[in-house]
């Protein structure tokens, strides 16, 4: 510290009571309301607000808990599109947690192809679809962009979601 002209930090040692830090952290995530969507974690034990579509997503290994402004913007865009009529076949490219694909599946009860380059994200998206009771509508696959033929063979997508940095 003295080499760069700052005070040395104070270091203390002690014993702390055991605590479930994962549960504590989950409780800190407040539900998010965007358009028709209400994004909440598994710790939310209250009723959904009237006329809202619930999306249960816990913050974790995959991107997309609803906290980031780009995710909120994408959910708002899906809400806007939903006001203009039904969609039948959706693609969520770079799905992360699957939040956008799940929003499509729950809004239109339509089939959704979800893809991500990260295998852990695909597993999280599949589990989130199961928890949200839409696993029958969702196919989540590991793919580097459009390389997997199942994406190209999925037919015409009438809505494509991609909350990614490219």
What do the predicted segments below correspond to?
Residues 38, 56-58, 116, 165:
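Conserved beta-strand segments that form the floor/walls of ligand-binding pockets within enzyme
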